[in-house]
Amino acid sequence: MTTIALATLALTVLCLPARAKPTIPWAEFRGSGGTGVAAESRPPAKLAAPAWKAPVAAGLSAPVIAGGRLFLTAIENGRLVTCAFDVTSGQPLWKQQAPDVPLEKVHAAGSPATSTPLADEGRVYVYFGSFGLLCYDHTGAEQWQKPMPTPQSLYGMATSLIAYRDTLILVLDNDADLPGSRMSQSKVIAVRKSDGGIAWETARPLVRSGWSTPAIWRHHGGEELIVPGSGRLTSYDPQTGAEKWFTPGFSRETIAQPVSGHGRLFASAAMLGGAADEQPDPDPFWKAMLQFDADKDGKVARSEMTRYFTFPLRPELPPEHPGFGIPLPSDETQRKQRQGETFGWMDKDGDDFWTRDEFFANLKFDRGKPRLIAIRPGGTGEVTESQLAWEVNRNIPEIPSPVYWNDRLYLIRSGGLLTCVNAGDGKLLYTERVGAPGQYSASPVIAGDRLYLVSNPGVVSVVKTGDAFELLDQHDLGEPAFVTPAFDEATVFIRTQSHLLAFRAEQDAGEIDN
């Protein structure tokens, strides 16, 4: 090679721009593809003072990031709003109100601003069960809106949007019946990003209200849209909406988003009411019942089943918590009817008392098994026998989704119980208490080689990924937190009950061990 050529090559190399740091896509619920993983992100392993802290109105949607902006939704002064913040400084950039509509009825622990937005390079898309779909550009200018009827839901709408090519996928499961039918009005739709028009719509008449976000499963055989629902998991063609396969056996309440890896699909759901094991210990339920034993005789009398009585579903919670259990109706006539039905269920000898022995003998957990399953690709019709690789029925979370990383699945359940499962065969690698008790609503997420867990009381636990449990850090946020965190290159963003916090590492932090 000539001297001139060498000089030219050297000059060319010198003039090439430095390689840009990778952009961490976290533009939808649980990040890119809903995986819950930001492999190249470098947030701090130990959380200290936040880089910034911004006040936010109430809401349960998770933050998403695109174009240097962070987006979320909230309910403020009785109005649904979409908010944008500067990622670097936390400064509010804009806030847009949705049309003024009656708000859907939600559970006391829920919010009409629960569904997480979805963003792309130029727009942000939001869904409110009370209104429908809205699309804004990154400056807050409305691009289109699509009003929709509010589905009838047991707790309020909570599903989040996902993207497939140039469409948005939205699951509208519904407790309302079709006219003149006992089938439900449930459906899944694909909406064009460009104008909000319907690309396709598929009925789901066999399922009722649910709270899970769907997922796209990409494997060697193609792409599938995976939609959990009450009692079953269903696969559709994401281009047309045609059903491909299903597997039954899930509980009435499906909340967790499916994930994939190791050539398989993983889906989970706890038993109705949140029970994590197939045969839960009845003793905590009886101890919770005794909180209504006014005369402290060790039995529950019919007369003690007052208007304040609540049958426990989550006995670890205090009775005043909205998630504790099933209260009696406020209407006196309905309350007396329910009281008689409920009491007669266990009072087999008719003496108007529940004893411990009666309670234990008649407490039934037949509301769908808690399940974590692995499905192999390639099935059609019912695939339970043909494609089920393995199944686990213990320590299944009620709300948080599993996260997959390096051939392992991680699940966090209420009480702060972290479970790690081998994704290949379903074998338990460990189950450990992280030392941060309480309920868990936020899904576990991974950045680099670290797992970030957020408890409802507001404690963040950082755990090293791997076959053995290793707690790296715990940090008390100082207020409750119910929302899955988000990441950029060096930051973990956490929404608490009233603030948005950014915990940022130095940009030149060292390499993360994988």
Region annotations inferred by a language model:
Residues 4-15:
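Bacterial N-terminal signal peptides
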Residues 18-514:
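Noncatalytic, solvent-exposed loop/strand surfaces
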